[in-house]
From Swiss-Prot:
Matches recorded under SUPFAM superfamilies: GroES-like, NAD(P)-binding Rossmann-fold domains
Assembly description: Homotetramer.
Protein name from the UniProt record: L-threonine 3-dehydrogenase
Organism field: Shewanella baltica (strain OS185)
UniProt enzyme class: oxidoreductase
Annotated gene: tdh
Pathway in which this enzyme or protein is active: Amino-acid degradation; L-threonine degradation via oxydo-reductase pathway; glycine from L-threonine: step 1/2
The reaction(s) this protein catalyses: L-threonine + NAD(+) = (2S)-2-amino-3-oxobutanoate + NADH + H(+)
Ligand binding (Zn(2+) 2): C93, C96, C99, C107
Length: 341
C-alpha cells in the first residue's frame, strides 16, 4: 500500500510502498479516504529535538483522518463494513487507575497513532474498535478528517463556562482559530485572539473572532479598552506555547479567571506566580480529547450550525504530498488535506 513514512532520521517524509497492517481480534481495518497534516506532523517532518527523542524510524506517521471500515475483528461489536469513521489517536491501556475510572484521556500509558505506532498517512490503518468514532451522514469527509484537532479546540474551549464571558485566545494556529469559533457559537461575549501571523489572524476573523490582534502592531490592553472591558478576561485559552503570550494572558486575566493550557512550551517557562495567587486564577492543563465526550460534542456542534470549513484552505492528492507539507510549513495556510482516493 502507499504510505508516508519517516524513513530516515533527517528532515523530510517519504512516499513508500508499505505492508498492509495486520488486524487483531478487537481491531478495525480502515481504508483511508482523507488525512490532514497536523503541527505534530510538521515537527516530525522537520526532525526537531522532540521528534528525535520520540519517533521510531522508519514508521508510517499521521493521525488526522477519515475512512471506511473494510474489515472487522472477530470480537468487535457495533461496527459494520462500510461505516464511515474517524478515530481517537490516543490508544489507552485500559488497566491503569484513570482508565478503570472512566478517565481514559488521562491514561498514563497512552500510545499515539502516528507517533508511537503506525499512523494514518497510508491507504489502510488498523486501530482498536474502541477508538473508532462513527461519522454522522450530515458531516462531510473534509470536516471529519480534522476531528482530531477540532477535538483539541473543543476540549480546551469547553473546559469552562463561556456563556456571556470575555475570552482571550493566545495563538492563532488552526486549533486556536477553531476554538474561537466554538466560543462564539456557544455564547461567549468577546472572543479576542492574538498572534503575529496576519494570514492566520484573517482566518480567525472569518471564523468569528470579535478581534484578531497582531501583538507586534497592537497593544492588547488598548483593544480591551476599545471593547469596553474594564476588569479583564474571564477565560483564557493558551494555544501557542509561547512564554510572552502566556505572560500577556496572566496580565490581562480578571480576578477569579480561568485558564486552559493546550500550547506546549519548547522548554521550561518562568512566570510570575504572584499574579496567579493574588488573582485567584485557576489553570488547567489540556491534552488531547475527552473520550468520547469531546467527540460527541464535536459532532453536535457542527450539526447545530457551527461552520469550521473556512479553516480548511488547501487540498492535495497524496502524490502531491510535498506541496501539502510546504503549504503547512509556510505559515500561510489553515488545515491542509491530503486525498487518498
Amino acid at each position: 500500500m502507499k504510505a508516508l513514512s519517516k524513513l530516515k532520521a533527517e528532515k523530510g517524509i517519504w512516499l513508500v510502498d508499505a505492508p498492509k497492517p495486520v488486524m487483531g481480534h478487537n481491531d478495525l481495518l480502515i481504508k483511508i479516504k482523507k488525512t490532514a497534516i497536523c503541527g505534530t506532523d510538521m515537527h516530525i517532518y522537520n526532525w526537531d529535538e522532540w521528534s528525535q527523542k520520540t519517533i521510531p524510524v522508519p514508521m508510517v506517521v499521521g493521525h488526522e483522518y477519515v475512512g471506511e471500515v473494510v474489515d472487522i475483528g472477530q470480537e468487535v461489536r457495533g461496527f459494520k463494513i462500510g461505516d464511515r469513521v474517524s478515530g481517537e489517536g490516543h490508544i489507552t491501556c485500559g488497566h491503569c487507575r484513570n482508565c478503570r475510572a472512566g478517565r481514559t484521556h488521562l491514561c498514563r500509558n497512552t500510545s499515539g497513532v502516528g507517533v508511537n505506532r503506525e499512523g494514518s498517512f497510508a491507504e489502510y490503518l488498523v486501530i482498536p474498535a474502541f477508538n473508532a468514532f462513527k461519522i454522522p451522514d450530515d458531516i462531510s469527509d473534509d470536516l471529519a478528517s480534522i476531528f482530531d484537532p477540532f477535538g483539541n479546540a473543543v476540549h480546551t474551549a469547553l473546559s469552562f463556562d463561556l456563556v456571556g464571558e470575555d475570552v482571550l485566545i493566545t495563538g492563532a494556529g488552526p486549533i486556536g482559530i477553531m476554538a474561537a469559533a466554538v466560543c462564539r457559537h456557544v455564547g461567549a461575549r468577546h472572543v479576542v485572539i492574538t498572534d503575529v501571523n496576519e494570514y492566520r489572524l484573517e482566518l480567525a476573523r472569518k471564523m468569528g473572532a470579535t478581534r484578531a490582534v497582531n501583538v507586534s502592531k497592537e497593544n492588547l490592553k488598548d483593544v480591551m479598552k476599545e471593547l469596553g472591558m474594564t476588569e479583564g478576561f474571564d477565560v483564557g485559552l493558551e494555544m501557542s506555547g509561547v512564554p510572552s503570550a502566556f505572560h500577556a494572558m496572566l496580565d490581562t486575566m480578571n480576578h477569579g479567571g480561568k485558564v486552559a493550557m493546550l500550547g506546549i512550551p519548547s522548554g521550561e517557562m518562568a512566570i510570575d506566580w504572584s499574579k496567579v495567587i493574588f488573582k485567584g486564577l485557576v489553570i488547567k492543563g489540556i491534552y488531547g480529547r475527552e473520550m468520547f465526550e469531546t467527540w460527541y460534542k464535536m459532532a453536535s456542534l457542527i450539526q447545530s450550525g457551527l461552520d469550521i470549513s473556512p479553516i480548511i484552505t488547501h487540498h492535495f492528492k497524496i502524490d502531491d504530498f510535498q506541496q501539502g507539507f510546504d503549504a503547512m510549513g509556510s505559515g500561510q495556510s489553515g488545515k491542509v488535506i491530503l486525498s487518498w482516493d
